[in-house]
Amino acid sequence: MFCLDTNVVIFAINQRRPEIAERLDREIASGTPIIVPAIVLFELEYGCAKSTRPEQSRRALEIFLSVGFEQPAFDAEDARASGEIRALLESRGEPIGPYDTLIAAQARRRGATLVTLNTREFERVPGLSVEDWTA
């Protein structure tokens, strides 16, 4: 199972890194479960809302999501896991961004490998599998 980070979705939609879209197509064709967490959806919707072309951005996002990715809601267990991750990383002096903490918790709780271009940030999270499809 894979979990897509916001930057991966943006690159897939905009076709700026064709290797991401190609890998995504292969994983979808093979039936691999792929999730787009609630926090990623929030970040994408925010990007659409502040875009100079919000209608076009929103339509591109709708087309991308129409593939049928799992979109798990952020629940109480995700909140607990996020709090634990944030506290641990802060105690080590290695905090990551608050949204990244929430995304990491959703991926880790579901046993998903997080696909991101920001591996250095997410590799700090114990027990989280991370991949960069551009590497």
Specify the residue positions occupied by each region the protein language model found.
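Short, structured coil segments at secondary-structure junctions
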Residues: 65-67, 126
